[in-house]
Amino acid sequence: MSYLLEFCHEHALSVDFAMFVLIWVVQLIVYPVFHKIDDRVFVSWHGSYCNRIGLFVLPLMLLQLIEAASASFFIDDMLAWLKAMGVLGAWIVTLVVSAPCHRKLSKDGMQTQVVNRLIRTNWLRTFLWTLVFVVSCLQY
């Protein structure tokens, strides 16, 4: 277990940078393109997108959560707690808002109002993961 915590802490800046870049690409490029995908192929395309993006997002999110929780416990300074709150906030928005939107799109197909909600609410995740990266830079 200590090896995992050490690994997460040593690579925190890289992981946080990866999430920072990924969330901005999703916000500015991927989600807006949802509006342009033909309705006849949207469900298939969206399912493929969710499966593939998950290969990148899930490991990064898990590493962030482990690192932020352990740093809050072992280091216990204001920046560690701020980063942990940012990571936790991003997880909450992901689970409570973004994931249900994606489930609806996967089930019902392209719905402009759902895509617009996804884009609008994703700004909060974009802010949170940007904050996490900035804090990580300050800690480095």
Language-model segment annotations:
Residues 3-63, 106-116:
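Interfacial loop at the N-terminal end of multi-pass membrane proteins
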Residues 12, 83, 87, 122-125:
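Residue-level recognition of transmembrane alpha-helices
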Residues 20-27, 90-98:
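Alpha-helical transmembrane segments
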Residues 31, 35, 73-77, 99-103, ...:
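Transmembrane helix-loop junctions in multipass membrane proteins, especially transporters and channels
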Residues 57-71, 125-134:
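Core segments of transmembrane alpha-helices
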Residues 74-97:
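Short alpha-helical packing/oligomerization segments
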Residues 100-127:
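Interfacial loop-to-transmembrane junctions
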Residues 136-140:
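Juxtamembrane boundary at the C-terminal end of a transmembrane helix
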